[in-house]
């Protein structure tokens, strides 16, 4: 019995989740995959286009070209270019063929893209500092408790198995039909009011995190729509050239007769900027439905992650179905995102697959039988060693008996020889 008890300890200790020496859940993902994809594209694309715009500026060298008279030196021509480039946002110094054309949009196009990139990074930044720490602590607690629930189930199976071994419950008629019920009645104290279940139920009445999540998604959608409006308007200017007329007669040059009244100028990078605006506009238009989809992701009533824990007793997943928008629906999504960190989920998923294989095998009964198989193997080895020791004992006893018989015969022979010598001497 002691050997069987020790074997049971080894079997169930293999299934218990080991406590790691280093901190658990180091790589928790505190942002949903679809949200992270939206952030990377919405923020990364403008930064990429800005780098291309500045690379084009470095390769060309100047963003404006003005036609100066041949009598001007290169310093005077450079002054005209610089003056007209600085006066792009001043309407009183410019006259365009297309009327009041906002030429400053061309000048500040890279910086406006940078502004949109910064604005689109604000919602994820707010989420990281306002909501992520709270979700991180809650997820660690929930996942640790889920592992503990699994461990308690293994301990309960061990307790039930030990009780059956001590009391001979296996010989009671009808125990096979009621094995699952009696198994958990023995260790009911292990499962009274699982704290993780009660904690998750409280999230159905909480809306703090879901409000922050929806606010971030709405803000992202609004910024993307504003960016699409700006890029669409900028692209509509493609039919208008970047040519304009600039006057530099101001200050000491106002009465200078050698300076022409107007200079014909052209913005060189307009064509490149319009191409970049088309690329950014197309990507943002395709990205907007994805952001709308993220608004409805928490509305999904999915509890697939927790459903596998229905194998364990008293863990009622049906009560975890969220009704509308609440924190519970958000926690379900983040549990699904970090399910690879939960070791008990992997083990229970294997048992669930065995259960759904159609063979009619109860996973917990299979777990108990697995312990019995291990104990049978150990008992078999013990029985074989006992038989071997018995055979060795029998062989030793036979050898000892043979030695005793040999010594007796030798002593009798010596006595007979001495008697014959005495008789002959007489």
UniProtKB/Swiss-Prot annotation:
It is found in: Cell membrane; Endoplasmic reticulum membrane. InterPro entries: Innexin (IPR000990), Pannexin (IPR039099). The modification Phosphotyrosine is found at residue 199. One of its GO terms (molecular function) is calcium channel activity. The gene is PANX1. One of its GO terms (biological process) is monoatomic anion transmembrane transport. It is a multi-pass membrane protein. Glycans are attached at residue 255. This is Pannexin-1. Keywords: Calcium, Calcium channel, Calcium transport, Cell membrane, Disulfide bond, Endoplasmic reticulum, Glycoprotein, Ion channel, Ion transport, Membrane, Phosphoprotein, S-nitrosylation, Transmembrane, Transmembrane helix, Transport. It comes from Pongo abelii.
């Amino acid at each position: 019995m002691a050997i069987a008890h020790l074997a049971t300890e080894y079997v169930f200790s293999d299934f218990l989740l080991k406590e790691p020496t280093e901190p658990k859940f180091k790589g928790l993902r505190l942002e949903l995959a679809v949200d992270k994809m939206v952030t990377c594209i919405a923020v990364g694309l403008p930064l990429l286009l800005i780098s291309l715009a500045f690379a084009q500026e470095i390769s060309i060298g100047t963003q404006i070209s003005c036609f100066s008279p041949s009598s001007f030196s290169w310093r005077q021509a450079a002054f005209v270019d610089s003056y007209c480039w600085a006066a792009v946002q001043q309407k009183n110094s410019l006259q365009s063929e297309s009327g009041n054309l906002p030429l400053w949009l061309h000048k500040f196009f890279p910086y406006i893209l940078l502004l949109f990139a910064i604005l689109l990074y604000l919602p994820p930044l707010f989420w990281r500092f306002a909501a992520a720490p709270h979700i991180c602590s809650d997820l660690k607690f929930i996942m640790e408790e889920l592992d503990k629930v699994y461990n308690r189930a293994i301990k309960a199976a061990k307790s039930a198995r030990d009780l059956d071994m001590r009391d001979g419950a296996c010989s009671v008629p009808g125990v096979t039909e009621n094995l699952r019920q009696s198994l958990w009645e023995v260790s009911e104290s292990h499962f009274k009011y699982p704290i993780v279940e009660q904690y998750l139920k409280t999230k159905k009445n909480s809306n703090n995190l879901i409000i922050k999540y929806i606010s971030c998604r709405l803000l992202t959608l609004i910024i993307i729509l504003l960016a699409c409006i700006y890029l669409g308007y900028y692209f509509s200017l493609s039919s208008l050239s970047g040519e304009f007329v600039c006057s530099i007669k101001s200050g000491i040059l106002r009465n200078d007769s050698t300076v022409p009244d107007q200079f014909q100028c052209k913005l060189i990078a307009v064509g490149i900027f319009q191409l970049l605006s088309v690329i950014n506009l197309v990507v943002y238009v395709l990205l907007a439905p994805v952001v709308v989809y993220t608004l409805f992701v928490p509305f999904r009533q999915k509890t697939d992650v927790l459903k596998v824990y229905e194998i364990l007793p008293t863990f009622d997943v049906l009560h975890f179905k969220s009704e509308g928008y609440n924190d519970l629906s958000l926690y379900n999504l983040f549990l699904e995102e970090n399910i690879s960190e939960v070791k008990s989920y992997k083990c229970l998923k294997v048992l669930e697959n065995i259960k759904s294989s159609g063979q009619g095998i109860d996973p917990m009964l299979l777990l108990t039988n697995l312990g019995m198989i291990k104990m049978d193997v150990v008992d078999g080895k013990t029985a074989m060693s006992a038989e071997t020791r018995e055979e060795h004992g029998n062989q030793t006893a036979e050898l000892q008996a043979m030695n005793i018989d040999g010594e007796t015969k030798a002593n009798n022979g010596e006595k007979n020889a001495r008697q014959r010598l005495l008789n002959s001497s007489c």
